[in-house]
Amino acid sequence: MGNAQDALKAKADYVTKNLEEDGILHALEELKMVEKELHLPQTKMDQETGPIATIHTNYGDLKIRLFPEQAPKTVANFIALAKDGYYNGVIFHRVIKDFMIQGGDPTGTGMGGESIYGESFEDEFSEELYNIRGALSMANAGPNTNGSQFFIVQNQHLPYSKKEIARGGWPEAIAEIYAEEGGTPHLDRRHTVFGQLMDEASYQVLDTIAAVETGAMDKPKEDVVMESIDIEGEA
């Protein structure tokens, strides 16, 4: 009986705290008594106004909208490195068709790279960003180990319906994209999403890179090079 009372008191305290700090709607959302209203920028790319990164590769350009509101520290890191020329000449060292393309390590081995913060920095998971096809996401070696490496999701097909994905807890709009366009939902809340491809030409370049011949450790046999990255707009 005591355990049940303690649990009830803890829940009541939690509700009271949320009411005092954030209001009744937030408290009800946290208790899942009402559906939380989310801004899902990947579902309305034509309406977004954040900074744009264009990765110029020897296979064409990858144009990406960045999301500083949801991942401020990650976007700031990427923009600063790009403007400093850190990524110039760096290869996509790991390419797996129907999965993703990964780069951002100046050593080209997957073992290097660093952030502007002098050390690895923390994950920035958002309920508003997901690893759908075309998502720009941070590569890592475990929780809170972000540096300079990133990947772009290329998968085009998942063996699940929208209903099955939504049942797993994903927002309806995101579940629909996963079901119809693909992605890597198993990476959500494991890798920080901070951008999204913007146009069809970029998706064609992504698919072309993903189809290159690879050797040991999924490394392309012929280098796929980031020649430079241009940044438009401010975070």
Question: Which role fits each region the language model picked out?
Answer:
Residues 1-37:
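Mg2+-dependent phosphoryl-transfer enzymes with acidic/Ser/Thr/Gly-rich catalytic loops
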Residues 36-235:
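Cyclophilin-like peptidyl-prolyl cis-trans isomerases
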